[in-house]
């Protein structure tokens, strides 16, 4: 396993990583790295890449899309293998009354979400040209963040809100399908080892919705003095991604449940 990161050399690495390369994704050295490593599968962290500082807005979005474009050009020019692009439910910012299919058009409203959606389109264009560039949308990924930059999921946001205000305010009618890191890794492994991919876009979801209030209560139970407050005007409905396409091709088995994992 090799790691390519735009973060500086202080970034933590795992013992399972053979070698780490610290380059921006549009660095001319990338082609040389890819030619030397020749990966069978490349996983672009996309929506979960902590190397991008989204507080800088449009400049970060430009760096994100240009870096992805350069990486894809070098990958496909060298024909080095499958390319997986990790996206999220964040590209759907509208209101939805039913599960969202893989073919639904993105409705991204924030700069970050628009950049992630633009990355999806770029990967799909390469897929349509015959390359194995696969978009994987992960639905409400959650788990224990190791850094502040990773604390972006709905449970982490609830924890921060509770610690800062003593309350977690939720819409009692809102529901969400939570996908634990560990389950997501198993599903990603199935994609990495698959002999052939049928489609250019897949959605990975637990397929099991719970009320946002229940999730908030699981979080509040681990935070002393924090209460859950209902507020019907507070937030939009969370999108729920249909996992039908992925389930038909790879199967879905959820091991880690929110009621036992949140707050661990």
Residue ranges of model-derived segments:
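NAD(P)H-binding glycine-rich loop region in Rossmannoid oxidoreductase-like domains
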Residues: 23-63
